[in-house]
């Protein structure tokens, strides 16, 4: 049995938190934790370039990395060949992601600054919605477009109004999270952090 030690870092507000009424934290999983959640040796997210990044900043970098996006497209080709994606090409996919990413993160930071965090997150599912008034819940946000589809997700735990812990994010390629490897891993990360925090 491996003893994990999930680390959490503050990403907002930057600097003095004395008068802040909103907080965004982000999980920094270590390699063993990520492997236990379904990642495979050799995946880009486990490389030296990304392993020391918290989940929020890792997403920002991954969604701008053409090599990662090329691999992502190839690894998920069966999903992109579905009618839902309208025969999207790899070039179009990479272009849409790399052009959307800066706008997504700029919008998120603007919402942080404007105190509108609660407007961008919604309960992950019915179960979380039912628990919302009483306890911490799992949440998601939806941003950006790929081939006219809202496909970017950021997952978090809502501790209370204005306080979130980001556990990861994904380019969602299918409707249900458990149907694709990347979103299954994100669900595992979210559930693991929720069990530790919630």
Predicted regions and their residues:
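Basic, Lys/Arg-enriched alpha-helical interface segments
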Residues: 2-151, 173-198
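Active-site beta-strand-loop-beta-strand hairpin of nuclease catalytic cores
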Residues: 158-166
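Short acidic loop-to-beta-strand element that houses the catalytic metal-binding Asp/Glu
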Residues: 153-156
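Short conserved catalytic/interaction loops centered on acidic-Pro-aromatic/His motifs
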Residues: 165-168, 175-176
């Amino acid at each position: 049995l491996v003893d994990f030690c999930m680390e959490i870092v503050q990403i907002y507000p930057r600097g003095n938190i004395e008068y802040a009424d909103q907080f965004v934290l982000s999980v920094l999983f270590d390699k063993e934790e990520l492997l236990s959640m379904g990642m495979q040796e050799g995946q880009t997210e486990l490389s030296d370039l990304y392993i020391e990044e918290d989940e929020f900043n890792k997403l920002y970098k991954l969604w701008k990395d053409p090599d990662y996006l090329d691999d992502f497209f190839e690894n998920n080709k069966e999903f992109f060949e579905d009618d839902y994606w309208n025969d999207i090409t790899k070039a179009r996919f990479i272009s849409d992601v790399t052009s959307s990413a800066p706008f997504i993160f700029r919008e998120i930071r603007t919402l942080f600054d404007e105190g509108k965090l609660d407007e961008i997150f919604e309960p992950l599912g019915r179960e979380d919605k039912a628990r919302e008034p009483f306890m911490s819940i799992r949440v998601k946000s939806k941003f950006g477009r790929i081939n006219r589809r809202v496909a970017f997700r950021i997952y978090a735990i809502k501790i209370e109004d204005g306080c979130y812990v980001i556990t990861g994010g994904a380019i969602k390629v299918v409707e249900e999270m458990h149907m694709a490897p990347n979103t299954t891993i994100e669900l595992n990360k979210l559930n693991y952090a929720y069990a530790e925090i919630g």
